[in-house]
Amino acid sequence: MEIINLFPLSIYRSKVGLDDALRKTLIQEIYNQENESKNNKTKMYGERSSWTGDVYGHEYLYKEKKFEVLFDHIEKHIINYVKKIGYNEEKIDFYYQRSWATVSRKNEYIKYHNHSQSHLSFAY
């Protein structure tokens, strides 16, 4: 585990620790979601845009049973991060607003954006 202080921003980096079988199952589920949304023939943001589940109706992965173990791990890391930067996690009410997968293939990209409504964001 490592904390990187970058100006006023602290970045927490760690391995989540999913076993390979579960990781492969989750990846397949993400591809299934992508394929399911292919019924919408129009790419939301252009031909070179990556697939982002949030704009295709898959913005609540944390509510899906298949992703429960992943989010249990993420929760532990969030609490660890908050403790490490000096906050009492018992005084904070943690909750997920949204969570989604992305699929980026060669020459595809995700447009610049921010998560201004969130105090913490993570990527896995």
Language-model features: where?
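Sequence-level motif detector for i,i+2 pairs with an aromatic at +2
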Residues: M1, F7-L9, K91, Y96-R98, ...
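Non-heme Fe(II)/2-oxoglutarate
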Residues: M1-N88, Y109
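Short acidic alpha-helical/loop segments enriched in Asp/Glu that coordinate divalent cations
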Residues: K84-Y95, N114
